[in-house]
């Protein structure tokens, strides 16, 4: 294989890895918007909290003498999902439910306030400096090599791909075949009609926040292990990128969030490799603007018709 092709292949691996985690976080944005038509701008901080919870659990278990990588990560996943889900439920009850019927600007201000509160809460309790995470998966598989370059898939990348696939599969099965999943779809179609038909819409909305928070927590554990460092401010940019992915794919569409995340991750990886890391954010948001100019509802979004 040529060195140029191997280099491109490596960037594709990196892009799919990054895009998978963006897609997981974007699920929360798109599900909440699909049902109540609001953006949860505190969602990125839930991702950050998931990273911190997994770090604390893994560190505690390692101090107890447990050093099996998969067991540590599994415990980190469980703890992060439980705590992040509780935060997601609390955000809905505190920041959204009281203002759900108010103007959207009020809900936006409430969400931004919750985001700032969570960010500063973690900064005060855990410190504002970077925290290094223990590296639990260090292996890699060489896919191809030339004289000066080798394309490889690390164990952590493989873990990210597998976990993302399983999480998306579980969510799809839940939405399509479970009773609560059907209730979620009904609320997404028409919230008022779903309420008239006897569906507990408050419960469905709270569940939507919990599911989104759980997905963000999974992404927090994965990216924390992938990058090896976390701080209280990682949630802002990750949240913005995931929001971009959701809008890119068509906000309100779960498959759109998946596609948008992958496109955004690959675009970032390629721009970092062939231009400069300084331009990756520029390329990401420029791509969003370009897509919205051509397809205002995103790739898989549906146009909304408002009757007056």
Curated annotation (Swiss-Prot):
GO terms for cellular component: ATP-binding cassette (ABC) transporter complex, substrate-binding subunit-containing; membrane; plasma membrane. One of its GO terms (biological process) is branched-chain amino acid transport. The chain crosses the membrane at residues 22-42, 46-66, 69-89, 105-125, 155-175, 204-224, 246-266, 281-301. Residues 43-45, 90-104, 176-203, 267-280 are periplasmic. Residues 1-21, 67-68, 126-154, 225-245, 302-308 are cytoplasmic. It is found in: Cell inner membrane. Its main location: membrane. It comes from the Bacteria. GO terms for molecular function: branched-chain amino acid transmembrane transporter activity; L-isoleucine transmembrane transporter activity; L-leucine transmembrane transporter activity; L-phenylalanine transmembrane transporter activity; L-valine transmembrane transporter activity. The keyword Cell inner membrane applies. It is a multi-pass membrane protein. The keyword Transport applies. Keywords: Amino-acid transport, Cell inner membrane, Cell membrane, Membrane, Transmembrane, Transmembrane helix, Transport. Belongs to the binding-protein-dependent transport system permease family. LivHM subfamily. NCBIfam families: PRK10740.1. Part of the binding-protein-dependent transport system for branched-chain amino acids. Probably responsible for the translocation of the substrates across the membrane. This is High-affinity branched-chain amino acid transport system permease protein LivH. The lineage of its organism: Bacteria, Pseudomonadati, Pseudomonadota, Gammaproteobacteria, Enterobacterales.
């Amino acid at each position: 294989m040529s060195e140029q092709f191997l280099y491109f292949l490596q960037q594709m691996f990196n892009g799919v890895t990054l895009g998978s985690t963006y897609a997981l976080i974007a699920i929360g944005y798109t599900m909440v918007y699909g049902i109540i038509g609001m953006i949860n701008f505190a969602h990125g901080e839930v991702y950050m909290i998931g990273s911190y919870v997994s770090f604390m659990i893994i560190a505690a278990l390692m101090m107890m003498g447990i050093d099996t990588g998969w067991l540590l990560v599994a415990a980190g996943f469980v703890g992060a999902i439980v705590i992040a889900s509780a935060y997601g439920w609390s955000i809905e009850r505190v920041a959204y439910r009281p203002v759900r019927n108010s103007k959207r600007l009020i809900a936006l201000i409430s969400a931004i306030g919750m985001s700032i509160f969570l960010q500063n809460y973690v900064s005060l309790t855990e410190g504002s400096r970077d925290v290094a995470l223990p590296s639990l998966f260090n292996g890699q598989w060489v896919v191809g090599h030339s004289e000066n370059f080798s394309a490889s898939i690390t164990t952590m990348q493989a873990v990210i791909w597998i976990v993302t696939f399983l999480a998306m599969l579980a969510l799809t099965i839940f939405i399509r075949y479970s009773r609560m999943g059907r209730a979620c779809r009904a609320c997404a179609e028409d919230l008022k009609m779903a309420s008239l038909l006897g569906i507990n819409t408050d419960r469905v909305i709270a569940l939507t926040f919990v599911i989104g928070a759980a997905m963000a927590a999974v992404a927090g554990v994965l990216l924390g292990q992938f990058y090896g460092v976390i701080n209280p401010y990682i949630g802002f940019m990750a949240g913005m990128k995931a929001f971009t992915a959701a809008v890119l794919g068509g906000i309100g569409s779960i498959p759109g969030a998946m596609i948008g995340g992958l496109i955004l991750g690959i675009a970032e990886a390629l721009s970092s490799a062939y231009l400069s890391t300084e331009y990756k954010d520029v390329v990401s948001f420029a791509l969003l603007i370009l897509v919205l100019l051509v397809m205002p509802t995103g790739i898989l979004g549906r146009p909304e018709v408002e009757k007056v």
